[in-house]
From Swiss-Prot:
Main localization (coarse): membrane
Extracellular-side positions: 21-153
Lineage: Eukaryota, Metazoa, Chordata, Craniata, Vertebrata
Positions where Phosphoserine occurs in the chain: S190
Quaternary organization: Homodimer; disulfide-linked. Interacts with DUSP14. Binds to CD80/B7-1 and CD86/B7-2/B70. Interacts with GRB2. Interacts with PIK3R1. Interacts with PRKCQ.
InterPro entries in UniProt: CD28, CTLA4/CD28, Ig-like_dom_sf, Ig-like_fold, Ig_V-set
Organism of provenance: Felis catus
Name by which UniProt lists this protein: T-cell-specific surface glycoprotein CD28
Role of this protein: Receptor that plays a role in T-cell activation, proliferation, survival and the maintenance of immune homeostasis. Functions not only as an amplifier of TCR signals but delivers unique signals that control intracellular biochemical events that alter the gene expression program of T-cells. Stimulation upon engagement of its cognate ligands CD80 or CD86 increases proliferation and expression of various cytokines in particular IL2 production in both CD4(+) and CD8(+) T-cell subsets.
Length: 221
């Protein structure tokens, strides 16, 4: 009898510890190729007619709150982020799914789900799970292959552009030839003008110094 009582006393605390904690399961790893990912958190607790809070944290120490939802199952609550993440979500039967969009490569990290029962008392939350490593791959843009139907307008534009380019080249050559011909005629005309005889200009005359004529008759008288 005493042995049964001791076993019962040892059994009840273990039940209480289990009931005060929510077990959460997550996938160990997710690879993101298109900057979007859906992370599901499965829990073992009945949230019917209870106020709860489900949140997603980033980092080994869960320092960044990525996305959160508050409410109950009587209405569909809204998911939101106070740290700049583009997030949404959905509540299911024993599952909370977080939709993360527009993720960047530098947001590759480990993410933890946290489930809390806020009301009625007592407050219950989950044991910290192993988390999910979200690996965001760099997005490479591949050139789209043109279908035969969509390539027809492209080749039509190429043909029209080629014809216009050919006529533009002909016009440029013709204008260049006219310009060279005009320039050559101007050069020949200039050379002809330089070869015509010109009237010599006035020459400078050298005058002898003036000396008055002597009157020899005056000396004779």
């Amino acid at each position: 009898m005493i042995l049964r009582l001791l076993l019962a006393l040892n059994f009840f605390p273990s039940i209480q510890v289990t009931e005060n904690k929510i077990l959460v399961k997550q996938l160990p790893r997710l690879v993101v190729y298109n900057n979007e990912v859906n992370l599901s958190c499965k829990y073992t607790h009945n949230f019917f007619s209870k106020e709860f809070r489900a949140s997603l944290y980033k980092g080994v120490d869960s320092a960044v709150e990525v996305c959160v939802v508050n409410g109950n199952y009587s209405h569909q609550p809204q998911f939101y982020s106070s740290t700049g993440f583009d997030c949404d979500g959905k509540l299911g039967n024993e599952t909370v799914t977080f939709y993360l969009r527009n993720l960047f490569v530098n947001q590759t990290d480990i993410y933890f789900c946290k489930i809390e029962v806020m009301y009625p008392p007592p407050y219950i939350d989950n044991e910290k799970s192993n988390g999910t490593i979200i690996h965001v791959k760099e997005k490479h843009l591949c050139p789209a292959q043109l279908s035969p139907e969509s390539s027809k307008p492209f080749w039509a534009l190429v043909v029209v552009g080629g014809i216009l380019g050919f006529y533009s080249l002909l016009a440029t050559v013709a204008l260049g030839a006219c310009w060279m011909k005009t320039k050559r005629s101007r050069i020949l005309q200039s050379d002809y003008m330089n070869m015509t005889p010109r009237r010599p200009g006035p020459t400078r005359r050298h005058y002898q110094p003036y000396a008055p004529a002597r009157d020899f008759a005056a000396y004779r008288s």
